[in-house]
Structure formats: C-alpha cells, structure tokens
Amino acid sequence: MTTSNRILLGVNIDHVATLRQARGTRYPDPVKAALDAEEAGADGITVHLREDRRHIQERDVLLLKDVLQTRMNFEMGVTEEMMAFAERIRPAHICLVPETRQELTTEGGLDVAGQEARIKAAVERLSKIGSEVSLFIDADERQIEASKRVGAPAIELHTGRYADAQTPSEVAEELQRIVDGVAVGLAQGLIVNAGHGLHYHNVEAVAAIKGINELNIGHALVAHALFVGFKGAVAEMKALILAAAAKA
C-alpha cells in the first residue's frame, strides 16, 4: 500500500487480445503489449481470463507469468476452473470479478455481501498460494465491509458508473461515491484500488483521491495506442495520474 500520494498504474491488456481474437490471428501479441507497457512505466499488468475465452487465452497468461518484470494482476470469476488455474500459476495478485457470458464487459461489482461464505472460501484458498486477493466491488459501504469480513486484504472499486455519467451533477455524485468508498475502505484497513471505464479525460479526478493505491486501465490505452503507439499511450496515462495525485 502506498504511503504517499504516489499512485500505481495497472495496465489491462485484454483488448489487445480482443483485436487478435477478432480474426483468429497470432497478432497483435498481448505479451509484447505487456512488455511495452512495462517499459513505458506500467507498475503491473492486468489480464482477465474469462470463462468464454473471448480475449485472453491460457497461453497468454502462462507466457506473461514467465516474462513480466513487474507483477501480474489476474482477474477471474469465482469458478472451480479458474481457482485451479490460479493455483497452477500462482500470480502475485488476484482480483475476483463477477462474470456472465452475455455481458459486453464487466457490468458491476461482485456481490460479496450476498455470498459471503462462497467468497470467503475463495479468498482463503487463493491466499494459501501467496497471492494478494482483491475483490472488484461497487463503492458501497455494505460491500466494502463484507469484503473486510471475508478476509480480502484489498478491494478494487468499480468506477464504471462515474465513467458513464452524463451530466455534471451525475459526474459529481458518482465521484463522491468513489471518494466515500475509498474512505470506508481505508477505515477498514483495506488496500483500495479502482478501475473500469477510466480514460484520458476522466482519470485525473479519480487519481487525485487520496488513499487510492492503484488504477487499472485498459480499453482507453489500447484505443489511444492506435494513434500514438502502446508505449506512448501508457506513458501519457502514467504522467496524467502522477500529476493529478501530486496536486492532491
């Protein structure tokens, strides 16, 4: 957990794999994207191995585990298949996320409060392999407190509602929800990360929230990389969030 206003950038490379899978080719290579991201200042690499394998594949994860210089944040659904795979690869960080086949992207946070026994068992099992387990949840006090009860050392607050807000009042309301969620998480002794839907025009307000440890960002980076290259996209984002955090 950071003790200053310095904030970490986790780069999600899922959508590099999305582009590859669209044509069933061997390119673009998400592993190369990860290495480029590290060179440009990424503090970690996030990948989500979905049940439907729509983007990242097992081979990608295995290769990344061998070559990353930073650390892997492995996003996964709470299924026996994924639990067994995580035990095999032993990533530094694991983030448990909700997952349905029909969704375009992760649509909301994990309902920890509604399934505490199941999530607690998963956290305990994954902690035994040495992984730091976080839970991807909405910035809701009930879910944050439940995350503490099940033994997770970290949470990732879902910023999608903030990213999707249309009017200034909606943006302010959703940003305040995140601010409050960070405060509750820190009061519970949790490491607080955040992510989902963040891009170059909305990230600074979130990066300026004191106490956030890491922001995980993917789609916006991959999209911007079409015009400036992946290293350039990551470097720009890193500069934005560090500047915003320094001003806070």
UniProtKB/Swiss-Prot annotation:
Its EC number is 2.6.99.2. The gene is pdxJ. This is Pyridoxine 5'-phosphate synthase. HAMAP family: PdxJ. One of its GO terms (molecular function) is pyridoxine 5'-phosphate synthase activity. Its main location: cytoplasm. The record marks E156 as: Transition state stabilizer. It is found in: Cytoplasm. PANTHER family: PYRIDOXINE 5'-PHOSPHATE SYNTHASE (PTHR30456:SF0). It is an enzyme of class 2 (transferase). Belongs to the PNP synthase family. Pathway: Cofactor biosynthesis; pyridoxine 5'-phosphate biosynthesis; pyridoxine 5'-phosphate from D-erythrose 4-phosphate: step 5/5. The active site is at H48, E75, H196. The keyword Lyase does not apply. Catalyzes the complicated ring closure reaction between the two acyclic compounds 1-deoxy-D-xylulose-5-phosphate (DXP) and 3-amino-2-oxopropyl phosphate (1-amino-acetone-3-phosphate or AAP) to form pyridoxine 5'-phosphate (PNP) and inorganic phosphate. GO terms for biological process: pyridoxine biosynthetic process. NCBIfam families: pdxJ, PRK05265.1-1, PRK05265.1-3, PRK05265.1-5. 1-deoxy-D-xylulose 5-phosphate binds at D14, H15, R50, H55, T105. CDD domains: PNPsynthase. 3-amino-2-oxopropyl phosphate binds at N12, R23, G197, G218, H219. Keywords: Cytoplasm, Pyridoxine biosynthesis, Transferase. It catalyses: 3-amino-2-oxopropyl phosphate + 1-deoxy-D-xylulose 5-phosphate = pyridoxine 5'-phosphate + phosphate + 2 H2O + H(+). Homooctamer; tetramer of dimers. Pfam families: PdxJ. It comes from Pseudomonas fluorescens (strain ATCC BAA-477 / NRRL B-23932 / Pf-5). Gene3D superfamilies: Aldolase class I. GO terms for cellular component: cytosol.
